[in-house]
Amino acid sequence: LFLAGSGVLFFNLITHSEEWAMNKANKHLYTSGSLTTAGDILDINGKVLVTTKDGSRSYNEDKSIRLATLHTVGDSSGYIASGVQTAFKDEITGYSLKDGVYNLQRYGKGNDITLTLNAEICKVAYNALGNYKGTVGVMNYKTGELICVVSTPTFDVYNKPKDIHTDTSGKYEGIYLNRFFSGLYTPGSTFKVI
């Protein structure tokens, strides 16, 4: 009976350890449910999109770049489920089955991730979208790299609207949705590209 219980415990440790380590109650990674310590997220040119400063996540200084790349990098609270900070949180925190989050505690940050996105192109696409709801995606057809992914509506993480969760007018509808990855858009005439 003891061996069976130990076996179940060991199996659960192996199969669920990442979930336990990434739980929002883990004070090594989260403060009040927000990711506070992780590696940098960079664009293809090395421009920092998100970093850790003084125990909290800091986004790019350029407001237009923050707005344009928010759905791709994600928010620290995890509302944008398809963002890098949520989808790759085990990698940016440096989690491993062998060491857990020890390296995060030892070095003060996790692993950096460099995206194929170009932040300046995303900024131009965001400005071109204006006040329209939609998405812009640019892909290198030879390599499959995503050069630009922009989704609107968006918000500035440094000035999040206070009524975002209580609004009934619909102006924030889909604000946490990355329309490029999760939108229900029918492809147009895709053969023209070829």
What are these regions (language model features)?
Residues 192:
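Short, conserved phosphate/pyrophosphate- and ester-handling motifs at nucleotide-, phospho-/glycolipid
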Residues 1-166, 170-175, 180, 184-187:
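Periplasmic/cell-envelope proteins involved in peptidoglycan metabolism and beta-lactam response
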